[in-house]
Structures are given as structure tokens and as C-alpha cells.
Regions:
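Extended hydrophobic packing segments that form well-structured cores
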Residues: 2-40, 45, 57-58, 461-525
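Glycine-rich phosphate/diphosphate-binding loops that line cofactor/substrate pockets in enzymes
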Residues: 61-82, 109-112, 338-345, 386-387, ...
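Short glycine-rich or small-residue beta-strand-to-loop segments that form or flank ligand, phosphate
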Residues: 75-90, 116-123, 186, 348
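Histidine-anchored nucleotide/phosphate-binding helix
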Residues: 87-111, 206, 375-385, 393
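Well-ordered mid-protein domain cores that form the structural environment of catalytic cofactors
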Residues: 93-171
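Short internal beta-strands
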Residues: 111-124, 254, 393-396, 472-477
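Conserved, well-structured core segments that form the ligand-binding/active-site neighborhood
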Residues: 142-343, 374-378
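C-terminal catalytic subdomain
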Residues: 360-472
């Protein structure tokens, strides 16, 4: 049985602790009394994944077996999560490939000829042919690409259809092919409690008209947290949209969960608690840190982006989305949930090299903000690990670097908007429509590999709850000019950051270090 998560209190015997800082990492000594949140040990993966998939398809939750839903002459659309999941990317064969292959085998046996596959990329950049092939596998790729395996296009006026509005007046507009299908099979990887469930189709196949109802400042400030659906206004909106979807299209969802094997064997020390490092782990740390530090940034980036994780699959559940998702969340909680007693004055997070929007790309400063104040700050249930008015300290070098193809509108947002204001509400009011409707950004989204024009604004809104909650934000090791552009302060060391934080929280602050990844979901009591 795997050990549960726990909270360590730093004392004289505690070794230096591993902290991520983008495409680098360090060992850091924390002040005595600092609380350190560790996730549960990695759960064992399912040994026979193919059998687990087949069992899920044939014995689903509150739905007929998939074989009973397939018939000749029907329109079947298989939808799958894009490259924003999982993080880091998983080793091949991808579990999505395994599921899709079995669904296609059952469809062929049932005489289903009209089959299309869609990547649920929402307002994300399109997946490249190579990325699609890596996700679905060579056999599926060769059989369906390019005419029947493609990316969702959230800006195709002919390819979208409005299904109705929710009781709150939210427009539900999704991909036409999916909406007009007899059955959607959605293939999901749930990395955190934020993923899956009602979100999958409503967001993955949605348009800007739909997404603006939940990807806005007010909703995100009242999503406390993204990983606590009960208290997330964003998830409440997803659920309302799912009700409308359920009136128009039948959805058979297949959700999978992963264990905590976030890093491969050559960096296995990153999966372990520091006092349990072997001599080999210590040697690996020293060697990798030396090589990593000596390498140019572009080389480090390429190496880390090709670091594929040997995840084990901890669950495969299929059927009606509302019936499946509770089982999925239970598996996520088994792997990630750690009880924490109360809040601290200061929260500390080390940010890794990866986020949902820099896969095979570059972590630009706006994505650093989104990763830290959005994704990592929101890795809690009930309450944040840091009190209201407290200080958030994040580790990341925050280089002033952008991918010119993927993040075209990010560059303009950074240069023309953040130089004027960092206020999410003002940005939303004054700039969102311009970025969302700009014809050049729309062209790049549809024909190149750029994120939608509005995407950098949404990533800024992603940190709105943290900006409202925290009294100060400090980045350790960050480029000072870049941090200042974003409205944050920079410190050279943790000691400097703590000294700066005392201006806000006093001379004897309590400190909590959220040690992730592997991901820990803090259940703050």
C-alpha cells in the first residue's frame, strides 16, 4: 500500500529540499518550522491496461455497453484531449491511442463507416501532424489523417453550431461535426481535479462565444479553487453547459487517471522525498545539475521537452459523463490529496519547465504567471495554503522569451498591454474584444500553429484569484525587468524574498512550501 501524503516540519535534521525553477532546479534550505507538503507515494499502475479499457467500454457507468450504442449507418465522432495533457508528456503508446484503437475495433465490428477523430484543442494551438501521430499512434494516424483526423476549429463559422443557452444565459456553441453525430466518444486524461467531467466537450469543442462565459475575470475570481469543483464558479458553468449538451447529443466518455511517476528513471530523484535519496540519486542530481547549468537555454528546453514520463494508469472509467467523473476524482484524490492544518503567512512554490501551453514550445513570462498564480496557487481544496493578504513566493527565471509562431498574440499583449496595466478587470474591459476578434490572430489560429488571439488574456485572468488573495508576489531568480513588467517583485535568493515578504506579513511569518511535482493537492482544513 502506498504511503499517504504528509506535511513535514523543517527541523535541524531536514536536508536541503528540491525546488524546481523552470528548466532548472536547486536544493534549498528552508527556515526551521517551515511546513512542506508532500503528495502520497505513487500508486501502482494497472498491469493490464488493454483489459481495463475493454472492461470499461463493455461495462460502463449508467450507460449501455459501447457495443450496444454502435450500429451501421451512424455518425461516430471520437474526441480526445490535446497536448495540454498530461504534463509532462507520457511515454508511448499513449493511453489515448490504446482507447481509440479499441473503440475503432468495436466500431468496425458493428459496421460503422462514418467515423471522424477530433483533437479537443479549444482555443489552443492546433496540434502538428507529428503531435497527432504521437498521440493516436501510427496505425490510426495512417488510416484517418488528414481528412478524418483533425483539430477542432473554434473560429470556423461553418463548423460550429449553437445548441442553446443555459438557465444563466450562457451560449453553448460547439463543433458541428460532433454536435450532429449520433454518438461522441470522448477520450480523456484527468491529470488534476480541474480536468474532465463537464469540462471536456463544453470547453474542448467550444467556441470563443461559449468560453467567454466561464473564462472571465469574475468567474475565475470566484473559482476557489479550480481543483475544488464544489467551490468553482467555472465548474458550475461547465455543469450548466453539460445539461444543454445532454439534451442534444449522446456522449460516452472514457476517463483515465495517472499515478505520480512524473519523471523517468534518469531523474528518478525528482519523484522522491529528499531524505530517501540513494547515493545514486545524489550523484544523478549533481551530474544533471552540472550539465543542465552549463547548457544553453535552447538545449535545456529541448532536453526537458523530450523527457517523457513513465506514468502508470490508475483507473479507466467509461459511460455517462456525470456518472463517470466521481470515480475519476476519487482516483485523483487517492494520488494527490494531502491534508494540511490551516494556512500560512507565506506560500512557496517551485515552478517546473512545463505547463499546458508550452508543450514543444517556450515558457514565456505570461505563462509563468499563469502557471504560478493560476495552476499551482489553485492546487488546493477548501482554502489556499496562504492566508488572505499573505505573500506568494515563486521560483522561476522568467526569461523574456516567446515562441514567435505559437505565441504571436502573447508578444503583443506583453508589449502593448502589460506596459499600460496589469489589472485583469481593466484588461478584460479595454482589450479583450480587440484580441479576440483581430483578423490576423484569427488567421494564425486557423492556418498556422498559434494560440487564439484572446489566449494570453485568459492566461492573465487565470491568476485573478491569486492576485485578489495575495498581498505581495515575489519571484526568486526572475529577470527583474520582466517581473516588474508583470507587476511582481524579484529576489535573488529565498533569504532575500523572505526579507521582502516581512514588509507585508511581519517579522515572524509562518511558511508553507508546496512541494510539487509530483502533484500534491492541499486539502487545507
Amino acid at each position: 500500500m502506498s504511503r499517504p501524503g504528509f506535511v513535514l516540519e523543517v527541523d535541524e535534521r531536514t536536508p536541503a529540499l528540491l525546488v524546481n525553477e523552470g528548466e532548472g532546479f536547486r536544493l534549498e534550505r528552508f527556515p526551521l518550522g517551515t511546513r512542506v507538503i508532500y503528495p502520497p507515494d505513487s500508486l501502482p499502475g494497472i498491469r493490464d491496461i488493454d483489459t481495463a479499457i475493454r472492461r470499461a467500454l463493455l461495462d460502463p457507468h449508467e450507460e449501455e455497453p459501447l457495443t450496444a450504442l454502435l450500429r451501421p449507418g451512424m455518425r461516430l465522432t471520437i474526441v480526445f484531449d490535446d497536448i495540454s495533457l498530461p504534463l509532462p508528456q507520457m511515454r508511448t503508446p499513449d493511453v489515448r491511442q490504446r482507447i481509440i484503437e479499441q473503440v475503432l475495433e468495436l466500431a468496425a465490428a458493428a459496421g460503422v463507416d462514418d467515423v471522424e477523430l477530433l483533437a479537443a484543442n479549444s482555443l489552443h494551438r492546433r496540434m502538428t501532424p507529428a503531435e497527432l501521430k504521437r498521440t493516436v499512434g501510427d496505425r490510426v494516424y495512417r488510416s484517418f489523417f488528414p481528412h478524418h483526423l483533425r483539430n477542432h476549429d473554434a473560429e470556423d463559422p461553418e463548423g460550429l453550431v449553437e445548441l442553446g443557452t443555459t438557465r444563466h444565459g450562457e451560449v453553448v456553441e460547439i463543433n458541428r461535426r460532433a454536435a450532429e453525430s449520433d454518438l461522441i466518444v470522448y477520450v480523456n486524461i484527468t491529470l488534476t481535479a480541474m480536468n474532465g467531467g463537464s469540462k471536456s466537450v463544453a470547453v474542448g469543442l467550444g467556441s470563443y462565444r461559449s468560453l467567454q462565459h466561464h473564462h472571465n475575470v469574475h468567474t475565475l475570481q470566484h473559482s476557489r479553487s479550480f481543483n475544488d469543483p464544489r467551490q468553482s464558479a467555472m465548474h458550475h458553468s461547465y455543469d450548466r453547459m453539460a445539461e444543454v449538451l445532454g439534451e442534444h447529443v449522446r456522449i460516452f466518455t472514457v476517463e483515465t487517471t495517472l499515478n505520480g511517476e512524473s519523471y523517468p528513471p534518469h531523474v528518478q530523484f525528482m519523484n522522491k522525498r529528499e531524505w530517501e535519496w540513494s547515493l545514486a540519486d545524489q550523484a544523478s542530481y549533481l551530474a544533471l545539475r552540472k550539465v543542465n547549468s552549463a547548457s544553453p537555454a535552447s538545449v535545456r528546453r529541448q532536453v526537458w521537452q523530450r523527457t517523457y514520463s513513465p506514468y502508470g494508469i490508475t483507473g479507466v472509467h467509461a459511460g455517462a459523463p456525470a456518472a463517470v467523473h466521481p470515480h475519476t476524482l476519487a482516483n485523483v484524490h487517492r494520488q494527490q490529496l494531502t491534508e494540511v492544518d490551516g494556512q500560512s503567512d507565506i506560500g512557496v512554490w517551485g515552478l517546473p519547465f512545463i505547463c499546458p501551453y508550452n508543450v514543444n514550445s517556450i515558457m514565456n513570462p505570461i505563462l509563468v504567471m499563469s502557471l504560478g498564480l493560476g495552476y499551482f496557487f489553485n492546487l488546493y481544496r477548501n482554502r489556499p495554503i496562504v492566508r488572505r493578504g499573505g505573500v506568494g513566493i515563486f521560483y522561476h527565471p522568467m526569461p523574456d522569451t516567446f515562441h514567435p509562431v505559437h505565441h504571436a498574440s502573447y508578444i503583443d499583449f506583453y508589449e502593448t498591454v502589460l506596459t499600460r496595466t496589469t489589472d485583469p478587470q481593466l484588461i478584460e474591459k479595454k482589450y479583450e474584444e480587440k484580441f479576440a476578434t483581430d483578423p490576423w490572430y484569427r488567421h494564425l489560429y486557423r492556418t498556422s500553429y498559434a494560440y487564439h488571439g484572446v489566449h494570453p488574456l485568459y492566461m492573465w485572468y487565470w491568476g485573478a484569484h491569486a492576485l485578489d488573495h495575495l498581498g505581495d508576489v515575489i519571484f526568486v531568480g526572475a529577470d527583474r525587468g520582466t517581473a516588474a513588467r508583470l507587476g511582481f517583485r524579484a529576489a535573488s535568493t529565498l533569504a532575500d524574498a523572505l526579507e521582502m515578504a516581512r514588509e507585508t506579513v511581519g517579522s515572524s511569518p509562518t511558511i508553507t512550501y508546496h512541494h510539487s511535482p509530483p502533484l500534491a493537492l492541499a486539502d487545507v482544513r
